[in-house]
Amino acid sequence: MPRLKLPKSFKDELESEKTTTTSSRKKAPVVDPKQTLMSSFFTPVSKSTDTKEINNKEDKDEDKDKDKDNKKTKKSKDTSDNEDMVDDNNKQQKEKKATPNKSNSPQSPQTSKSPLTRRSSANGNSDSKIDNKEKEKEKEKEKEKDKSTPTKTTSSRVKKDTEVSKSIPPKLSKQTKKKQISSDNDIYDDEKDSEEEDLEDDHDDEEEKVVVKKPSKPTSKSITAKPASTKATTTTTTTTTTTSTGRTRVNRVNLDISFSSESEEDEKPKKKIIGKKRKKKDDSDFDSESESDTISEASEVEPESEEDLDSFKFNSKKKNNNKNNNNKKKNDEYEDEEEDEDDELFKDIEMKDKPEEEEKEEEGDPIVIGSGRVVLPKGTPDFQPDPKAGKKLLKAHLEIQSKEEAKRLQQANGGGGDGGGGQIKGSDDEDEEVKKPTKGGSKASAKKKGPAYTPLEQQYIAIKKENPDTVLMVECGYKYKFFGEDAEVANKVLNIYSYVAKNFLNCSIPTQRLFFHLRRLVMAGYKVGIVEQTETAALKAISSSKSQPFERKLTRVYTSSTFIDDDIDDQLTSSSPQFLVSFYESTPKNKNDDVIKKQRDNEEEGIDSSNESSTSTISFVAVSVKTGEIIYDTFKDNVMRSQLETILTHIKPSEILIPPTTTTVNKQKVNNGIGTNHYYFSNLTSKCLKTYTKSTNVRTQAMDSQLYDYEYSLGKLIDFYEDESNNNNNNNNCEDVLKFVKSTLNKEQIICLGILLSYLNEFIHFGSILKVESNFKAFRVSNHLVLPHSTIVNLELLVNESDNKEKGSLIWLMNRTSTFSGSRMFINWICKPLNQLELIKERQDAVEELVNGIKTNSPPIVSIISLFKSHIPDLQRNLSRIYYKVQCTPKEFLNTMTSLQRIVELFKEINNNNSSYKFNSTLLNSIFKLQNDNKDGDSDSFDYIGGEDKLSKRIKYFLSNINKETAKEYGTVGCDKSNLWVDLEKYEKIRETKEKIEQVEKEFKNVLKNIRKELSKPSLEYHHMPGLGLEYLLELPPSFKAVPKSWIKVNSTQKMARYHAPEVLEQLKILSQSRETLKIQSQESWISFLGEFSVDYSLFSNFVNKISNLDCLFSLAKVSSLEGYIRPQFVKEKKDGGIQIENGRHPVVEAILSGSDGSYVPNTIELRESACKSMIITGPNMGGKSSLLRQTALIVIMAQVGCFVPATSCSLSVFDAIYTRMGARDSIGTGKSTFFIELEETSDILKNSTQNTLVILDELGRGTSTNDGVAIAYSTLKYIVEVMKCYCLFVTHYPLLAQLELQYPTQVGNFHMGYLEEKQDQQLQKSVIPKVIFLYKLVKGAAQNSYGLNIARLAGLPMEVIADALKKSNEMKESITRRANLSDGKDQQQIENEIKSIIKNWNSNRTTLNSNDLLQFIEKFKSIQLKL
C-alpha cells in the first residue's frame, strides 16, 4: 500500500489553524495524531468516502436487500490512490452543495476506541497507510500543545437535551468551513442551507442547538443518524437522561456510521462547555419527525472566534428499529415534555451566568454535565419522582437579586470586564432573550438565548420578582391562574388539579370563585396577591401596543389581618377584629453591653440574674383594618412574659410584625434613637411569641431593621401625614393627627406605628386608616379588672379546655348579641370587666331598665327587639371598606346606608318628646342622642332638638346621588357603574360617552334599514345572544341564496344562519370601545364619590359604636332575665367588703344541665375583711372543689361586667384583679416542666397581688414530692395571709395546711366539700374500700380523707391494682401513726410541764395573759390529746 503524502499547502494551513486554536481557546483536548490521520486521510475509498456523495447515492438507491459482499468489493477497488480521493473531495466540494446532515456522535461507554477504528484494524489496511515520520512529527506537535492546554476527560453519553449557548454567533469564514481538523473531541456539522435555516426560524422558540468550535480539516463531513433501513453500518448506543423533575429515561439509538473518518468521534471525548451554562430544553424542542428523545452529548471546545460558532449547530435525529419500542418512546417523550417544562425557567435562572464547570466521570457514578443535570448510570429505573421538583422559583429570584446587587456595586465602584460570566441580565436583556434570531443566525445578537417564555410568563416573572413572598393569582380572561411554586401551594391548600404547560406548573380557578379560594389561602397563612388585567380587548385593539399582551398589574394584596373582602358571614371570623400588631422591646438603661449580655444568657437558661434583668419593657401598637381600631400600650413584664401573653389573649392578633431574623438574632444592635443599644427581642420574648404563633397559627412577617430606628420611623410618619395634608383629599386634618401622635405616643410606640405604616403601604389604601384620630385608643389594663392569660384560660372565658370550642365557655352563655360589631365589643367587655364602681353601677342601671322593659314589653324595648331581629350587615367593616374606596361595591354601599337610615329613624323615634319612650338610665339616654347638625361637628354635644340631625342629612345626601334599583344589581368591585348616577350633570364625561353610544345605536338602525332594502326583507331584525357575548346578528334561513359575500357567518342551526355584516362589525368596534371607556369613567366617578365619605367617617363610626353598645347591653339584659339571676350589690366600705354569695351557682354548668334532668347544687361562700379572708378547701376528689373556685370567680367577673348573677343574694367589693393557678401543663418548646410552670405562675401572683385581689390556688405543690409540695404550699399560703393579705381560695389535699387555721383563726378558715361515707365493720375497714356519696356542699372543717381509691374504682382500674393500693395505704397510715406516737411520747412530759406552767400563770395573773399565750396553750394541749 503506498503511503500518503500530505500536500504542502495543506500542511501550512494545518499549522496556522493549530496555532490559532492553541492561542484562542482556554482548554483544548489532546488529539491523537495517529487516529486523526487514520480517520481523516487513510480511509478506504468507497461510497462512504464522501458524505455528500453517499447521501446522493442513497437517495437514488432504495433497494434494502443489496449484497454486503458487493459493497465490500466496491470499497476495496477504490483504495488505490488516496491522493485522488483528496482531490475528488475538493472537487465535489466546489461543484455542489450537499444537503447538511444533522450530526450525532454516540460514544462507547466502555472503550476509548471507536467501532470503526476497530473495523479498520481488522481489515489490515489502516496501519500500513501511515508514514512513521509524519506520525512522529504530529506526536511532537501534539505533546507541545498538550503541555500548554491541559484537559479533563469525561465520557460522552447520548441524552435527550444538549447544552446550548444563549446567543447565536455569526457564521464561520469560508476558509474555515472548507478545511477543519478532525479530533475525537469534536462534532462536525456542515454549513446549513437556506431550507434548514427556515426550519430553524420556524421552531426558534422550541429548538435548542449546541454551538461548538471546529478546527479546520480538508473536507467538512458530518455524521448523520439514519433510519435502520439504510445500507450504512449501524451501531446501537444506550444512554440515560434525566428530566428536570428528576425522572430518568433509558434511550437506545441506532446510528448509521458511513465511514471511518467520522467513526473516530465515538472515542471518549474531553468535555468542554461553551460559554455560560445553559439549561436543556424539553423533548418538544427537536424535530417533530424524530419523536425519540436522544441527542448525543458532544465534545465541545472554545471557539476561535464568534463566527466559528454559527455553522456548527447540533441538531440530531434518531430512529429505533423496534416499532414497539419507538411507540413507547413517543409516549415517554410526551410525558417528560409535560414534566420537564415545569422548572425549565427556574433552573435556567439558577444555572445561567455561572462559571464553566467540568466534572470527571467515575465508572458507575452519576455524571454531572454542564447544565447541572445528572446523567445516572446505565440501568437506573425509568421515571423516578423528585419530591423537590418545581420548588426553586423563590430561591432563584433571591439569587438573581443578590447577583444584580453585586453587579450594581461593582459598576458603582468602577468595576468592569466580563465579570467572570456571573452577572445577571437586566430587564432589557430578558426581553432580548425571547426574541428570535435573524435567519441563519449570521446577524444574531451576542446575548445568550434563553427559554421561550410566553408573554404571560414574562409578566408573571416580573411581578413575582418584585413580590417573592406573595402567592400570585393572575387574571387570564375568565380564570385566575397560578404558576410555578404558587401552583404547588394552590394544589396543596385548595386541592385543585395542577398540570405542566409551557415552562411552569399551572392550575386555575374560575373568576366567580375568586374570594372563596382567596379566603382559604389567606386563612392558611399565605400572603396572596391579585394580578388583574388593566386592559380590555376593545381598548387594546385601538391602543398603540395592540400587538403586545394585555397589561396586568398587582392591584390587591391580602393577608390574614387585611382580608376584609369576604362576603361570607362567618361568625368565627367576623367576630374577630383581625388585629395586625407590632411589638418593640426596650433594653434596660444604664447597662453596659457585658451586663446586658450576661442577663440575656441567664434568661435563656431561665435564671433570674437580678430584679431588673427579669423584667422587660414592651411596647406595642395594633391596627384592625376591619374595624379601624388602633390600640397602643407600654407595659413592664416579668420573666414569664405573662403580660405579653395577656395582651395576645385580649387582642388575638391575626398577624404579628417581628424584627428581621438573622443568625445573630438577639445579639444585633440598632441605634434606636432612644439612647440605648437595642437587641431586638430577648430570648424570652421571642420564645413567648413563637409559642403563641405556633399554637394559634398566627402569621408572622419579618420587617426591615431600619424601621426599628426611632428617627427613621418618625420621619416616615411625618412624611405620611404631611403628604396627606397637602393632598387635601379629606378634612381629617392630618396635621392635628400628627400632633396627637407626637404628644400621646412614646418613642417606642412611635417606632411600632412606623413599622405598621410601612407594612400597610404595601396594601391598597389601608394606610389611610391611620389618618383618623378617633381610631386611636389606649389599651389600659389598669382601667379594668385584670384578667391575665392564665385566668382567661383556667376560667374558660372564651373557649372550653376540653376541645377549645366556644360551647361550654362563659362567652357562649353570655354573648347574645345580634350584630357583628356588637359581638366583637362584647368579647372585649368579658375580657376587660370594669373596675370603677360608678361605671359598674351605670351599666347595671341600663341592664336593669332593659330587663324590666323585656318583662313588661315596653314600646321602646319592643322596637329595639324588632330592630335586632332584622338583618343588620357588618356596619363596622362596611364603613372601613367604604373608607378604603376600592373595596366597596354599590350594592354594599346601598345596604349600609339604608341600614343606617333605618336605625337612625328608630333612634329619633325613641328620643322624641314622647314620655313613654324616655329612659331613666343615663347610659341609654346618651346612646339614643344624635348629633345636631347645628353643632357642626362638635363631638361633645349629641342633643337632638327637633331639627334634622347631621347623620340623617349625610345619609340622605349619599342615597340621593345613586339609583337605588340599579345599585342593587352592582354587587362586584369591577362591575359596570354607568347607570348608577341619578344626575349626570356632575359627571360630564360619562354623559358625553353615553351620547356617543346612543349615536352608535342609531347608526345600527340605519344600517338595518339599508340591509332590509338590499335583501328585500322588511321584517329583518337584529338578534342578540348575551350568553355568548354576541349581538347585532342578522338571522337568515340557510336556504337564502342572496347573502352578500362580504358577510361573515357567525354560527348556524338547521333552521337559521347568523351573520355579521361589515357595516355592523365596524359599528360594533366603535360600540365596544365606547362601552369600555364608559366603564372606566364610571369607576373613576365612583371612587371620587366614595372619597366624599371620608369626611364623615368619624361621624358614622361613632354612631356604629353606639349601636354596638346598645347591642351589648341588650345581650346582658337577656342573660340577666334568666330565672334565678339577681342584681349584685357593691360596697364601698373596706370593712364591709369581700365576697358574700348566698346559694351561688356555676352559670355555665347550670346552663348545660338545664337541658337535662340534672340540676346544679348551690353553695354559699363568704370571704370577709373582718372575718375569714382566706379559705382552705379540702375534701374528696371529684367532690366539686374546682367547680366552686370557678363559680366564685365567674360570679365576680359577671358582676363587674354589669350583668346579673346566679345567686339568691350577692354582695361584693370591687376587685382589681383575679389571679388563678389551676390545672397542670408543661411547655416543651420553652423547656419548662409542669412543676416549673406551676411555681412561675405562683411567683407572678405573689408579686402582683394587692389587698383587693382575688387569688385562686388549686392544689399547689402537687407536681413534686410530698415533702417539697407540702412545704411550698404551706409557705405560700402563710405568705399570702401574713404579707399579701388578699382574698384567697386555696384547695389542697395536704392535711398539714389545716394547721394554719390554728395560727390565724381570724384570717384563715378550713372548709371541705361534704360527703357521706358508708359505715363498715371494723374488721372490713382494712380490706374493703368504703362507699362514698358526694354532696357537693361546702361544709365547715377540714376533711380527713381524699378517697382517692374510690375515684380509682370509678375510673375502672383493675381490682388487683386497687386491692394492692388499699393494702399499701393502710400500711402507710399505720407507719405515720406510729411515728407520731413516738414523737408525742418523747415530748409529752415536757409539754405537760409547760401547760401546767401556763395554767398556773394564767390563774395567778389573768390580766396579763395575751392571746398568743392562749393559742400556744391550745396548740400544745391538742398535741398531747388532753381533754379539758
Curated annotation (Swiss-Prot):
SMART domains tied to this protein: MUTSac, MUTSd
Species this protein is from: Dictyostelium discoideum (Social amoeba)
Subunit structure: Heterodimer consisting of msh2-msh3 (MutS beta). Forms a ternary complex with MutL alpha (mlh1-pms1). Interacts with exo1.
Keyword DNA damage set for record: yes
Keyword Aminoacyl-tRNA synthetase: no
Entry protein name: DNA mismatch repair protein Msh3
InterPro entries membership: DNA_mismatch_repair_MutS-lik_N, DNA_mismatch_repair_MutS/MSH, DNA_mismatch_repair_MutS_C, DNA_mismatch_repair_MutS_core, DNA_mismatch_repair_MutS_N, DNA_mismatch_repair_MutS_sf, DNA_mmatch_repair_MutS_con_dom, MutS
Stretches for region Disordered: 1-391, 405-451, 592-612
Gly residues biased stretches: 413-424
Residue ranges with Low complexity bias: 217-245
Comp. bias intervals (Basic residues): 270-280
Compositionally biased residues, Basic and acidic residues: 9-18, 49-80, 88-98, 128-149, 346-357, 592-601
Polar residues composition-biased segments: 36-48, 100-125
Coiled coil feature spans: none
GO cellular component annotations of the record: MutSalpha complex; MutSbeta complex; nucleus
Functional note: Component of the post-replicative DNA mismatch repair system (MMR). Heterodimerizes with msh2 to form MutS beta, which binds to DNA mismatches thereby initiating DNA repair. When bound, the MutS beta heterodimer bends the DNA helix and shields approximately 20 base pairs. MutS beta recognizes large insertion-deletion loops (IDL) up to 13 nucleotides long. After mismatch binding, forms a ternary complex with the MutL alpha heterodimer, which is thought to be responsible for directing the downstream MMR events, including strand discrimination, excision, and resynthesis.
Keyword terms, alphabetized: ATP-binding, DNA damage, DNA repair, DNA-binding, Nucleotide-binding
Any one biological process term the GO annotation gives: mitotic recombination
Comp. bias (Acidic residues): 186-208, 284-309, 333-345
Pfam family of the protein (one): MutS_V
Similarity comment: Belongs to the DNA mismatch repair MutS family. MSH3 subfamily.
A molecular-function term among this protein's GO annotations: mismatched DNA binding
